[in-house]
Amino acid sequence: MKTHTAISNKTHILATSPVVRNFLLFVVVSLILIKAMGYGGTKGVDILFISLSLLLLSAIPLTRYFLVIPYIIFCAIYAPVGVIYGPPSVSVVSALFQTNRAEAIEFLYAIPAGCYLLPCATLLTLFILARYSWQQPLPVRKTLPFWVIFIVLLFARILSGGVGNLHLVDFFSSLISSYQSYNQQMAEIEAGTHSQPSWLLNGANSNKANYVIVVGESMRRDYMSLFGYPTPTTPFLDHVNGTFYSNYISTAPNTFESLPRTLALSDGKTHHIADNIITLAKAAGLHTYWFSNQGLIGQFDTPISKIAMFSDEHQFLKKGDYQSRNTDDDELLPLLQTALAHNGVGNLYVLHIMGSHSDFCERLGGEPPVFTSDNAELACYLSTYRKTDRFIEHAYQMLQATHSPFKLFYFSDHGLSHRDIDGKLYLRHGGNNRQNYEVPLLVLSDSDRQRTLIENPHSAFDFLSLFAQQAGITLTQPQLPAAVTAQGKRHVFNGQEMVDFDQLANDPPELL
């Protein structure tokens, strides 16, 4: 009985100890911060490491004010991104630097309301810590046992080689490495813009026609009725004659990394920006135009806008600065109409549309969604397919009206993946599923007399080869890769490295 009483007394003393209460408070805070940093699964070692780090750093006023408080505030700011996209990556960093004001506002509106509870909870931890922990800082001598535990834990992780796997370390190392990778890619692109194209053609281009490339955004192939989705999302493409590629994949899961690898020569990790679709067309004697509804930021400092600058004539509907506005893709059509009316054959027109870029409902230009669903976001997303389908139809009709030979290409830069947020499915960027890369590719021409389905595997890394083939361009150098890729040998760039596409997880479409 005395033993039981002694144990109870010690337990009571331990539970009421300010040091223990402080530590337990930091345990709760660490759980919130881990979620805010974008990590789903949580291990005990991560909770212990963050709790100890916060407790020990908070004991010293200087580190509390210059490390702990800024860290918690940063986590609160990052929390909405972390919930949706996970820890920092090149995709997140590039979006941060290349999103204009209008797109930033759309992003905030597109975040599910429940996601804003986490940053509020994260900020709330500051007030809780200030009220119940920091008003009476722990004496240094009382933190000594925690220092011992922290040092033992740290050395154990160092010896096992697992320090980098700790969420706190991984978060900041991912942030730094992603920023460095972003800067490296931008530096390579900048250097490439000052290089000369290396195209050497075998004779003059005899295929005098007009070529239109419509570059889409965020469209998954499996949501198109053209490729079997039961809801009629692409009625025009369902019936028009042309060539349709049912096994085509993009190079990367986001615009920043996908389009430079699609529209310029690339080995996957790097790309030669000067050897791009525009300089290839110009080498073949085509006059080039670039009409874009995507943002032009600063002094032409996005990878795709740098390619656009190689064109003979270019026009951006939004400039990407504070004057950016929510322009509709349909505003590009009069530009194409005017150009076709004033020119003959021998031209390349690139139309870069917003397509199915989030916020999906904003892409509809004020029109109500074509489809209805309990999932309003999915209804708007599929309605953007109808809008893109109509855009392609109008461009096709304009080309037909010229009574001149033409070829119209359409592809999407990347797909999206489903995310379960608070029990509801959303479509967001990702790089771990096949559907992040499974996108449409089609070619419509004036000479099509039937519908042709190409089931052979193709990769966007070979888009230049396909375009050259369709345009009758024969190159002496550099040698382009084959337009058809053997099954099982397709690799994609996931933002960090080249990975086997066929080994990625499946993410099937949702039905309305």
Question: What is each residue range found by the language model?
Answer:
Residues 2-171:
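Transmembrane and membrane-interface helices of multi-pass
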Residues 2-25, 37-43, 58-65, 131-133, ...:
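Membrane-interface soluble catalytic domains
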Residues 50, 54-55, 193-197, 334-341, ...:
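A long, amphipathic alpha-helix that forms part
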Residues 162-214, 218-369, 460, 464-496, ...:
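Active-site-proximal alpha/beta segments of enzymes that process anionic O-linked groups
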Residues 212, 387-426, 467-468:
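Metal-dependent active-site segment of extracytoplasmic phospho-/sulfohydrolases and closely related
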Residues 256-257, 436-438:
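Short, solvent-exposed loop/turn segments at the edges of secondary structure
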Residues 268, 321-323, 374-385, 431:
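A short acidic, glycine-rich active-site loop
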Residues 290-292, 349-355, 382-385, 407-412, ...:
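Short beta-strand segments
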